[in-house]
A protein has these predicted regions:
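Short, well-formed alpha-helical segments that are part of the catalytic scaffolds
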Residues: 16-29
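Short aromatic/hydrophobic "clamp" motif used to bind/position activated sugar donors
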Residues: 88
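Conserved donor NDP-sugar-binding/catalytic core segment of glycosyltransferases
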Residues: 102-131
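Conserved short acidic donor-positioning loop in nucleotide-sugar-dependent glycosyltransferases
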Residues: 27, 42-43, 70
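Cell-envelope/extracellular polymer assembly enzymes that use nucleotide-activated donors
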Residues: 6-8, 36, 183
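A conserved acidic beta->alpha catalytic loop
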Residues: 41-50
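Glycine-rich, basic loop-to-helix element that forms the pyrophosphate-binding segment
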Residues: 67-83
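Conserved nucleotide-sugar donor-binding catalytic segment
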Residues: 143-216
């Protein structure tokens, strides 16, 4: 599969100067010449754009596009929409990919004949040596299916890769849903069959004060409302 498959990395960024360099280094070393990193910047005001431009001067596999200025979900959707690869890997601006992540995930696509893979990760603080959870799956749980994931979502975008055939189902991502990764996971299970959860950590998932996304909690009434709205949007696809 790797000889013919093209990998696209879809990354949404916003004011990511602190960790972006390390993340891009960890990604690019794993990619082949025909692969690409599509970065959608949502109006960064720090040195994020300068960092990306420096990388682009040395590496033509990086493409920078202007984000829609409509928040993280639509910024991610914008990056996905501009990808050209056979397999799309989602990437946050502040994590670090472990060596062999791309190779291992592509192996799973080949072995399982699936359309979406979610792998485990190690949750850290701002410093990667600060281990918060040695296994996100052990902390959160894991497994495919609507019943298992509607209340407590186990799909985690930064650990997700999917086949390009899912894109017409995924896009556009509704503005009023809460989680883009849950949206993608459910649509795969609905239209392409069960997602594969790989209990191998292939990423350092960094949690810090500047995180764009978080583990945030809502009140039960808000959660119920969000889930009902989410299901309505799902059934429309």
């Amino acid at each position: 599969m790797r000889n013919s498959a093209r990998v696209s990395v879809a990354m949404a960024v916003y004011n990511g100067e602190k960790y972006l360099h390390q993340q891009l280094d960890s990604i690019l070393v794993q990619l082949k010449g025909k692969d690409e990193v599509v970065i959608s910047d949502d109006g960064s005001t720090d040195s994020t754009l300068a960092i990306i431009q420096t990388f682009m001067e040395k590496d033509p596999r990086i493409r920078l596009i202007r984000g829609p200025g409509a928040g993280i979900k639509q910024n991610i959707a914008n990056a996905i929409a501009h990808t050209a690869g056979d397999f799309i890997f989602l990437a946050d601006q502040d994590d670090v990919w472990m060596s062999g992540k791309v190779r291992r995930v592509l192996e799973i696509f080949r072995e399982k004949h699936c359309h979406l893979v979610v792998h485990d990760c190690i949750v850290t603080g701002a410093e990667l040596s600060e281990i918060i959870y040695p296994s996100y799956f052990d902390y959160r749980g894991y497994g495919a299916g609507m019943v298992r994931n509607i209340w407590k979502n186990k799909y985690i975008g930064c650990c997700m890769a999917f086949h390009k055939s899912l894109v017409p189902y995924i896009l556009p991502i509704p503005d009023d849903i809460q989680m883009h990764d849950q949206w993608i996971g459910f649509l795969n299970d609905k239209h392409r069959g069960g997602s594969v959860f790989l209990k191998e950590p292939l990423l350092y998932y960094r949690r810090h004060d500047e995180c764009v996304s978080d583990f945030g909690t809502n009140t039960v009434p808000v959660m119920i409302k969000n889930r009902l709205l989410f299901l309505c949007r799902q059934f429309s696809r």
